[in-house]
Amino acid sequence: MGLKSYSLKSIILFIAILAGIALNHSRAYAAQTKTMVVAGGCFWCVESDFERVRGVIKAVSGFTGGHTENPTYKQVKTGRTGHFEAVQITYDPAKISYESLLKLFIMSIDPTDGGGQFCDRGDSYRTAIFVSNAREKAIAEATIRYAKRTLRRSIRTQILPAARFYVAGPPHQNYYRGTKRVLTRFGIRKQSEAYQAYRKACGRDKRVQRLWGANAPFITH
């Protein structure tokens, strides 16, 4: 009986040690990752683009920058909440820098358009970079200068203080690779098919390629 009790205690202790190691590893990993928030028009598109980037761990669609708490997609689309459609990007700074991510971002949008993006019009589709500190602000300002110098046009993408980020509902997460069948203006399609049809019809890639040429990232054909 004593031997069995000792063995059980040893097993429990071993499991506890493993759990502690796993927890410490998880905390250390979380401490090594960083997040950033950008608004680039349709959040499905921005999420889709950045989840392809090496060093990006995840991209989450949501809303930020407004005055309405816990906004819904329908509320934000009215333009009365002050919120932007935005994406929160979690990344590993050892694999990709904040500066590189911002450069990819600015070259994946039309920063000269202050009224929305591509076929999506209205305040919720405006573009912005949300910064958390002086370093991020300086890098964002340098990115805007780069865009202005490259495009030789006035840049309408805003640099704003980071605000609370509200995660959009499940139907809006990973829409670009969803398998659920939905009714759209293109008929009944799988979400992934509806996304591709929408992106093409909206002219996002054509406009970005026209602006940025060979430097344009994320172009799909």
Indicate where each model-derived feature is located.
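Bacterial N-terminal signal peptides
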Residues: 2, 9-22
